[in-house]
Amino acid sequence: SFGTSALGDMPDTYGYSVNEGRARETINAIFDSECNLIDTSRNYGFGIAEQRIGQVIQERGGLPDDFVISTKLDRNMKTQKFDAARARKSIEESLEALKVDRIGLLHLHDPEHCKDITEITSPNGSLAELFKMKEEGLAETVGLAMGKTELMLEIIKEWPFDAIINHNRFTLLNRNADELYSYAYSNNISIINAAPYASGVLAKGTEKSRLIAYSEATDQELEPVKELEKICDKYSVPLPAAALQFSLNDKRISSTLVGVTKPKRVSETINLSKFIIPNEAWEEINQLPYSTHDVEAARQYKPG
């Protein structure tokens, strides 16, 4: 599956801009590919990502057959308010922007950043509103998309979610989401593992990127990546192929979500998913140490 946060033009997060023309070409490439899920959010680029997807859907005369839109209810980014009324406003904005009358997979997004968690978890909060939207037919399935795995685990134990999205916390470098994924899998909650490239460095390598989980990495933090690069070079394996297939090969994970910003990245990603990696390479990769801490613990969240 493919993610569209950068297609909302978020230079504060990614360090570069994506203009409308390139974004729309990329969205068309996603719709024309063999994948069947596109993920976005009300707050990606303050609504720009959804708007661009909606324009493409309108131009194509509707969503492709059997294609799933995954989007997210978001808090008010100015006030951080995330009560039921804000959740209702968020879905209304999404439906209008995306040019659809229902959402295939609708998540509650980033509750850890809201002003007051009780606005979300109370009996009349935004979570209850999310499930009401499913009852009303505005969403076919509902999920929880967030980062902090401990809070995420608490919430999914209390509510009957169909799916979850977690990002940056189950990669070749980090396994912070391992317990969360085991619980979700054993309770029939579909898992979408996002950001298998650790937000950059596992796609581009240490020569071109120092980004790990949207932050500049130290030399020490880059050492495990360099060890991975040595193994991949030894077996002539592209580093991003190993990073992607690490997620794809985990039986618990239903879908691996990769952000793309150029049309050619869609076909390149699909090709990486099919690259044949020798067992000897996996044996060496699997012996490397990894982190289990929250890789985004010190991240300064930037909405743009």
Set out the residue ranges of the language-model regions.
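Structural motif corresponding to the early beta-alpha repeats
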Residues: 60-81, 109
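N-terminal binding-site loop/beta-alpha segment at the start of enzyme catalytic domains
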Residues: 1-67
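Active-site mouth loops of central-metabolism enzymes
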Residues: 7-21, 73-86, 117-118
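Beta/alpha (TIM)-barrel catalytic core signal, keyed to glycine-rich beta->alpha loops juxtaposed to Asp/Glu
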Residues: 111-287, 292, 303
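Active-site groove signature of glycoside hydrolases
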Residues: 95-116
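Acidic-and-aromatic substrate-binding clefts and catalytic sites of carbohydrate-active enzymes
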Residues: 41-50, 76-81, 114-115, 170-175
